Each structure stands twice: as C-alpha cells, then as structure tokens.
Amino acid sequence: MSKEIDIEYYHQLALQKQKEHRKVLANLKKKPPKNLDKIAQQIHEEVFAEIDCTACANCCKTLGPDFKEADITRIAKYFKMKLPAFEAEFLQVDEDGDKVFKSMPCPFLGRDNLCSIYEVRPKACREFPHTDRKKIHQINHLTIKNTLTCPAAYLFVEKLKDKL
C-alpha cells in the first residue's frame, strides 16, 4: 500500500481555494474550449498516476453512494441474497428518497482501504470523483463539492486551472 494521504491537508487547501475554483469552473462553463474533454482526460490520468485511492479511501469512509436498482441487484446477486434481505441489511432511504448505506464508513471497505466488492461496486463508486466524465463543465457544483472530500478532485481542478 502507498504512503497515506493527509486528507485534512487537502480539505483545508480545497476550502481556501474554493472561491478561486468556483470562478475557474464558472468561466469554463461559460466558454468551454473545444478540446475540454481531451484536456480533462489527460489531467485525470496525470492525477491518478500521482494519487493512489487506496492510500486515502476518504470517499468510502465519508460519502455513501446513491444506490440504483441495477447496483442493488448486482451486489445482492454477488452475495447470493434476495433483494429485500440485502436492502434490509445494508440500505436505508434518505431524505431525498435515495437508497444509501445505513451507516458509514462503507461496510464493504476493508481495513486495508480495499473494496471487498470492487468488481461489482455501485456505479457511483466506479465513477467517483467524476473527473474523467465528458462535458465536465456541466457538473461544476459536484466537482467543487468533491474537492472537499477527494484529494484527486482537488488536484484535478488545480491542474485544470493551470492548463487553461
């Protein structure tokens, strides 16, 4: 396993730069460059060459995914559980009507920061922090929010700012 990531350090940096990041992303939304998807993909790859998620796992410790029916079906099947039994054991409905974990950290996160259901993990987990998404300028609010939790998202915005 890699050197542990100082989550609080990145959180404080993200708080300090939140206003600047909002401005950069707002400008990007107003006039996105034609090659934005390509730039974002390159930056995403650079960041994840630097950051080892298993040295952090803050998303797994503090953010619960929104479970879609396909996620529930896939994971219940993996555990050879009936859907109602899986939902009763692991999930609850939040104030927005979304199905989320009953408690955090994620019950499938191991002490080694590895996901015990990695190959069948929820779509939200597979895609987090959404920095390789096409048309990233359409999810600025989510990108800013993710910088507060995810060091990779913070570095992504910093590198994006420097490239534009």
Question: Where do the model's predicted regions map?
Answer:
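Short loop/turn segments that flank or connect secondary-structure elements
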Residues: 1-164
